[in-house]
Amino acid sequence: MTKEWISLGQLGKPFGIKGWLRLNVRETVLCELKTPISLKLSKPDFHFPEKEITLLEIRPHGGKFIVRFEGVTTPEEAAKWIGGFLFLPQKLLPKIETKNEFYITDLIGLQAIDESGKKLDWKLKDVQDNPAHPILVFVKENGEEILIPFLQVFVGDLDLEKNTIVLIQPEIWNEI
């Protein structure tokens, strides 16, 4: 998937008897968009071809969301889409209003620096959802991954123009 398409989240188990699915959201912008809307569905299964789908409805439910798609009307049909990732054309994203706003996808590839501005050999590879808080997944040049909670106590300023993210006391993560 290219940068023209932004990952919105991953589909979970069916919900109810009318073909709804749970959605683990990566970007909450989906709630701001007018439905119906055309999205791409992709699964990490080579037997499941990427396809364009139409999102008919999205609702908040228990801290997450449930979604309904065109042509999916039973739990059995919905079950085929479990684990699928939803992608939105980047051009449909609402514009960022302030310096402190960003999309998760904008963070991927940021260079880690320490509080003094010293460049670390870590790049941000992914942001994983976690019930308590998001987890930043950094990868070192040697391929080793380092997981850091996305909390103010560990993460300082983000500078999308300079492509950097400040890590507070990064040496503690090297020892773990």
Swiss-Prot record:
Compartment(s) of residence: Cytoplasm
Pfam families in the record: PRC_RimM, RimM
One MF term in the entry's GO annotations: ribosome binding
Location (main, coarse): cytoplasm
Domain of life: Bacteria
Domain PRC barrel: 99-174
GO CC annotation: cytoplasm; ribosome
Biological processes, Gene Ontology terms: ribosomal small subunit biogenesis; rRNA processing
Keyword annotations of the record: Chaperone, Cytoplasm, Ribosome biogenesis, rRNA processing
InterPro entries the record matches: PRC_barrel-like_sf, PRC_RimM, RimM, RimM_N, RimM_N_sf, Transl_B-barrel_sf
Signal sequence region: none
Subunit structure comment from the entry: Binds ribosomal protein uS19.
HAMAP family, alphabetized: Ribosome_mat_RimM (MF_00014)
Annotated NCBIfam families: 16S_RimM, PRK14590.1
Family as reported in the entry's similarity comment: Belongs to the RimM family.
Comment, domains: The PRC barrel domain binds ribosomal protein uS19.
PANTHER family according to UniProt: RIBOSOME MATURATION FACTOR RIMM
Function as written in the Swiss-Prot or TrEMBL entry: An accessory protein needed during the final step in the assembly of 30S ribosomal subunit, possibly for assembly of the head region. Essential for efficient processing of 16S rRNA. May be needed both before and after RbfA during the maturation of 16S rRNA. It has affinity for free ribosomal 30S subunits but not for 70S ribosomes.
The protein's name in its UniProt record: Ribosome maturation factor RimM
Organism, as annotated: Leptospira interrogans serogroup Icterohaemorrhagiae serovar copenhageni (strain Fiocruz L1-130)
